[in-house]
Structure formats: C-alpha cells, structure tokens
Amino acid sequence: MINDIKKQSEQKMKKSMEALGHAFAKIRTGRANPAILESVMVSYYGTDTPLTQIANVVVEDARTLSVTPWEKNMVPQIEKAILKSDLGLNPSTAGTVIRVPMPALTEETRKELVKTARGEAENTRVAIRNLRRDANADIKTLLKDKEISEDEEKRGLDDIQKLTDKYIAEVDRVLAEKEKDLMAV
C-alpha cells in the first residue's frame, strides 16, 4: 500500500518536472528553439490552430528558426501570428519559407526572463510539496485505519520526504542551468 503511494507520488513528481521542462523551453535564451513558437496560434480557416500543426518549425542556425507551412497560402497568416505573439520576434518571408531570427537579449530582458524562470521553478516546488502533503495524508490515513504499523508509517513518511528532497534538488539544478543559459552573453 505504501509502495503504491510512493510510486504514484513519484509519477506525479516526474510529471511536474516535465511541465517545468516545457515551461523552460518556452523561455527564450537568444538561441533558436522550436518550442518557443509552440504557443503561437494561427487563424487557419477561421479556427485558431497551433503553429506547429500547420507548419514545420526547424532550427536553421544558432539564432534562426525556419518555418515552412504545409500550405503555401498560409504564409501571410503565420507571419502575422508570429508578429502578434508577445514573443518579440520579427519574422521575414522568403518565398514560402518564413525565417524567424532570435534577437539578442538585453541585460534587462535577461533579468526579466530569469525572474520568470524562478517563478516557474517555485511553482513546481510548491506542486511537489503539495504532492508530498497528499502522500503523507494517505499514509496517515492507512495508520488510522490500522492497515499499517507506526514503524511502517514512519518509514513511508521518510521515503516520501527523500523523494521530495530529490525532486526539489532536481528543480534547483534545472533552474541553475536555465539561469546560466539566460545570463550567458
């Protein structure tokens, strides 16, 4: 029973880490990363559609993304959608290919992005702690229902704490890496 709680908690903590990874991928570092354009919505036959579903987005070089729409007539809408997004990107069109250069980050922008990254990391830490709280409550319920002994409860709580510490340390490591990435000129 305790093992089930531990496995469930670990799976949820892994999901929290994956969510943090996705959030960090969307924070631009000045280097080209296709994930930056995942949030861009394009009006596709009257429906807002994610850019990644109507075009191929690839890294052309370290500072440029190349967007190739699957339908040539979508080029103007895609360009407009990228301009309207709050990403601060300025696309240029060459035939059916849209090139999106990544602007160099100013010191002020870097600091703002670091703040955003820290906020995302803190949200993930809170989520992990909430998962710990839930797992601990489940273990204490098992003790109250006399399904486990006090020793098993203590061992279970310790294991959940170790799991929490491991994932919080992982959040800190990923955040430090992202900050280093953002502050590199």
Swiss-Prot record:
It is found in: Cytoplasm. Keywords: Cytoplasm, Protein biosynthesis. GO terms for biological process: cytoplasmic translational termination. SUPFAM superfamilies: Ribosome recycling factor, RRF (SSF55194). Pfam families: RRF. Transmembrane segments: none annotated. GO terms for cellular component: cytosol. GO terms for molecular function: ribosomal large subunit binding. Responsible for the release of ribosomes from messenger RNA at the termination of protein biosynthesis. May increase the efficiency of translation by recycling ribosomes from one round of translation to another. Belongs to the RRF family. NCBIfam families: frr (TIGR00496). This is Ribosome-recycling factor.
